[in-house]
Regions:
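Extracytoplasmic/secreted proteins, especially bacterial periplasmic and envelope-associated proteins
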Residues: 55-58, 62, 76, 80-84, ...
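Active-site-adjacent substrate-binding region
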Residues: 202, 214-336
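N-terminal capping segment at the start of a domain
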Residues: 23-77, 132, 300-310
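Second-shell loop/turn segments in exported
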Residues: 40-51, 67-76, 97-101, 133-143, ...
Length: 336
């Protein structure tokens, strides 16, 4: 037993050493860990007058209060939420579709808005956020924030159609007991795209995008050495992916930084690091499709994660508006 324990300890030490060396090497070449934010300072909603802080706040409040609970049992909980999201998306004038799927726990639904591109030969971009919660918790940051950003992004899309088609998806089941299984809502949607022969150019999962802090030391890290590369304040948004996601991380980060909305940092690492694949991009990566996560880093910053204190009053809606603006920057690059 002692020998096994020592082997495990040695393995962890070697992994951290390898990751450290990889991080130092990659800083010179590209973003494994990269201090590459060209924007500093607190965002102001006046920078993008069409994006409404009030809408973001109202959406989170509705999801956390009027439509609570958003837990998977019984399925009628999430059916009410899906109906409401579908109604909001239809108000934008986009084509709205609903994908019902069966699981061992019941039938659930993905809600999909399609912004049709002018060039049908090009691949599609997918931006999605799950609308269920972990147990009975309010789930303001996880993940009413992601749904609110998704809906506000769709509401403020420019009128001219893009060259590449874009899907905006509210996923029905992401939390336990579905997480990591074939019954995640995103897994059902990814398989449908794959079965239809639809080429996915990029998938972005929005998960926990509303908690920010200017307090020193408010940002923590899975490994201490990462403090060498990242700020100690939780005032930035992160683009995260696995070791094979480097080119997609760079594309998303480039578009977000071009919007000059808020600081953007990126991280690329092995999936055994906690949080790397903890969202709907996981389903796409399982099929070999592009997928990255846009996040406030969840439990590494937000002490309310998966707690009853994850309430609307803890979120920063001005910075959520900045995330919407940053995503417009990504779509501008992807759609051209």
């Amino acid at each position: 037993m002692l020998a096994i324990a020592l082997l495990r300890i040695c393995g962890v030490v070697l992994f951290i050493l390898a990751l450290t060396l990889a991080g130092v090497g990659w800083v010179a070449r590209g973003p494994l860990v990269l201090r590459a934010s060209s924007f500093t300072g607190r965002p102001s909603s006046s920078t993008w007058p069409s994006i409404s802080v009030q809408n973001l706040r109202a959406t989170v409040k509705t999801l956390c209060e009027d439509l609570s609970p958003r837990s998977y049992h019984p399925p009628s909980n999430l059916a009410r939420v899906a109906d409401w999201i579908a109604g909001r998306l239809r108000e934008t004038g986009l084509v709205v579709m609903e994908q019902d799927y069966r699981t061992s726990e019941g039938t659930y639904r993905n809600v999909i808005a399609l912004r049709q591109g002018t060039d049908r030969q090009r691949g599609v971009t997918v931006i999605g956020a799950h609308y269920d919660t972990c147990g009975p918790f309010p789930g303001a940051d996880d993940n009413a924030s992601g749904v609110a950003v998704l809906l506000e992004l769709v509401r403020t899309l420019p009128k001219p159609p893009p060259r590449s088609s874009q899907f905006f998806v509210a996923f029905g089941t992401e939390e336990d007991p579905f997480f990591g299984s074939q019954d995640m809502g995103s897994a059902h949607f990814a398989r449908k795209l794959s079965d239809d022969g639809t080429r996915v150019e990029l998938m972005i999962a929005l998960d926990l995008v509303g908690f920010f802090s200017d307090e020193p030391g408010s940002q923590s890290f899975p490994y201490g050495f990462l403090q060498l590369y990242y700020p100690g304040r939780g005032d930035f948004i992160a683009v995260v992916g696995d070791l094979g996601a480097g080119r997609w991380i760079r594309r998303v980060k480039r578009g977000m930084l071009a919007a000059k909305a808020l600081p953007v940092y990126s991280f690329r690492g092995p999936s055994l690091i906690p949080g790397i694949d903890w969202s709907d991009h996981f389903s796409f990566r399982q099929l070999g499709l592009p997928g990255v996560l846009v996040t406030d880093t969840a439990f590494l910053r937000n002490a309310h994660y998966h707690q009853p204190t994850d309430t609307p009053g803890t979120l920063d809606y001005s910075r959520m508006a900045a995330v919407v603006q940053a995503l417009h920057g990504v779509l501008a690059e992807e759609g051209t």
